[in-house]
């Protein structure tokens, strides 16, 4: 049996890429998706995935903690990065009203822009949600008909909220 890992932070300097990647392959992990959390990390994720196209793919996006960095230039860079064959999703994106490293308004703006981009490109989303269920589900519901799908990678809710995400086919 082989395994896939859908959210590895190989762009984190604390995680030594080569030995971890080699151990993963030895442990029958056949495919890994590297998570992009801002423009720099998204560029790094794409670069790594291009080096190992049979084993690595990338997500590109802006994590809610970095939403204060999101603007027109960010959106343009994400659109350009999306041209890479290694890009399989938009994210890690979403809302985090627990830590609030970016304001809720900044997070809502960045999240909605990334949802629009995912819809335009026909890509799924890689989602993060912490203590922001209502606002996140409202935006997801707004775009769900044109959104290709996605996965809720981080969420702090209860079973009822989990079922609501499942009702959205996420």
Label every model-predicted segment.
Residues 1-170:
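Mid-domain alpha/beta scaffold segments of enzyme catalytic cores
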């Amino acid at each position: 049996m082989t395994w896939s890992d859908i959210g590895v932070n190989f762009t984190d300097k604390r995680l030594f890429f080569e030995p971890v990647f080699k151990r993963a392959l030895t442990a029958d992990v056949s495919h890994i998706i590297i998570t992009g959390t801002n423009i720099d990390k998204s560029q790094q994720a794409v670069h790594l995935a291009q080096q190992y196209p049979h084993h690595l793919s990338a997500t590109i996006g802006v994590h809610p903690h970095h939403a204060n960095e999101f603007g027109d230039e960010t959106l343009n860079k994400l659109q350009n990065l999306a041209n890479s064959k290694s890009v399989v999703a938009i994210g890690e994106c979403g809302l985090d009203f627990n830590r609030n490293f970016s304001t809720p308004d900044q997070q809502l703006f960045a999240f909605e822009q990334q949802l629009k981009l995912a819809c335009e490109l026909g890509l799924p989303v890689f989602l993060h949600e912490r203590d922001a269920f209502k606002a996140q589900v409202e935006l997801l519901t707004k775009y769900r008909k044109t959104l290709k799908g996605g996965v809720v990678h981080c969420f702090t809710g209860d079973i009822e909220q989990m079922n609501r995400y499942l009702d959205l086919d996420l």
